[in-house]
Amino acid sequence: MRHLGRFASLGLVASFATIVVAVTEVHSSPRGDRGRSTERGAALVPQVRSLLAAKCFACHGPDEATRQAGLRLDTIEGQRADLGDGFVSIVPGDAEASEVFARVLEEDPDLRMPPPEAHPRGLSSDEVDLLRTWIEAGAPWGAHWAFLPPSSESTAHSLRETIDLEIAERLHLAGLEPHGRAEAAAQLRRVSLDLIGLPPSAEEVEAFLADPSDAAYGAAVDRLLASPRFGERWARWWLDLARYADSKGYEKDDGRTVWPYRDWVIRAFNEDMPLDRFAMEQLAGDLLPDATDETRLATSFHRQTMNNDEGGTSDEEFRVAAVVDRVNTTMEVFQGLTAACAQCHTHKFDPITHEEYFRLFAIFNQTADADTPDEKPTLAMKVDLAWLDAPLEAKVPVLERVAEEARRETRILAGGSFLSPTELVEPGVPAVLLADRIGVSMPRDRLELAAFLFAAENPLTARVLANRIWAELFGTGIVETVEDFGIQGSPPSHPELLDALANALREQGWSLKRFLREVVTSET
């Protein structure tokens, strides 16, 4: 398998080429051909959305508390708003009649937008051209791409064929030629590092080179996927996402017993536990109807938060900090969203309100753990280690739901401070994730949230995980900002390929090994 490191900027080249083509075609299109013009303008929406998010949304975006002059530019209704006195924010098809565009060109610094004190350089000439072209093309808008369901168009091609076709097409558009196939020894070394994190032994290289058959590479891939080192290599990837640490952090940074969770992750990957079950046990293993010590151990995913053993600290302050960390980690890992920005105020760029953040918080707020030196609740486990004469009892911090009579009420914390509780809220998720698509009811606990995240209609989870795996293999994600699928994140360099990967991951039963085999046996 050849890595795309040398083509890391290919997606950007292709995206830029798309923009140039779209801009050129719009300017050369007949003025009356509104249908074609709008269709071409739609190609510019991701770039326009990113531009407005970076330069305008802080004052004219989702956050009502900081919105200036009543102007909102993150919705089509706000963009088309009548500002009074004959002024309209954006007039589709007529940039010169659009007040937003006029303010961008305004020479008076007191009237120019964005304000010089916020953006001293204003918009570049390329950004002005992009805005003008988009408005002249009808100012199309619509939901952010990541909140739309992946394309489900059927294809006669396998995933590996789809990968090769998509990459070859973009190389052609960019005027690039693919490199020839790597030498056999290099192929084996690369796939070994990808799948088990170790180079092949001299004996393995010799055996591979001695077999010239077409089946040799596939057999090597199968051997690597079956290796116990596979789980160790991919556990390193996951444990980084889970913020795993063998110490508690803060000033004392004492050690803690969490390695059984690490070993659980390794076992799960070696056994090819489906990723939806893998996630469900970590998010809510204690709530499963058939909960076992193993599923409870998996909830240590939530207990990787820092723990403060210093005297004189507020237990409630650090308990709240731990719940906040769980909300932020869950949304970032599985949804690719920077929900943390809504902890103190409504998100400045993405459609997540301050209230919706604390509805998520309420889902994680019903746990029995606290910021204490013993890190209760813990799970006592007998562990047999080869170098010990007797089994070792490990007490692993896990998550446990509080008793019904001890359930906490959840209030919005003004400014994110545990000292400033305000209105009561019920458990839930941001409305943008519902959008009348998800085939489950509003989640009210961690188990329902896990089901919600992996519902077939959820537009984010499969894309985010497929992109994370792709980035782990190739060094760069199809969405370069692997942690941010929101409005300020990078648009996908190959959107059709990303959707094909997401659909395949789900259709293959969330099997990591099957997914990896398809990718590493492609010509890419």
Predicted segments with their positions:
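Short metal-coordination and nucleic-acid-contact micro-motifs, chiefly zinc-binding Cys/His arrays
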Residues: L52, F334-A340
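Short pre-active-site segment immediately N-terminal to the catalytic Zn-binding motif
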Residues: A322-E332, A456-T461
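Solvent-exposed helix-loop boundary motif
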Residues: V21-R132, E136-D164, A168-E169, A185-R190, ...
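Primarily short, surface-exposed interaction patches in extracytoplasmic proteins
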Residues: G122, H157-R189, D194, L198-R229, ...
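Juxtamembrane loop-transmembrane helix junctions in multi-pass integral membrane proteins
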Residues: H3, R319-R326, M442
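Short cysteine clusters
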Residues: C56-C59, C341-H345
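N-terminal export/targeting leaders of redox proteins
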Residues: M1-A42, L224, W238, A245, ...
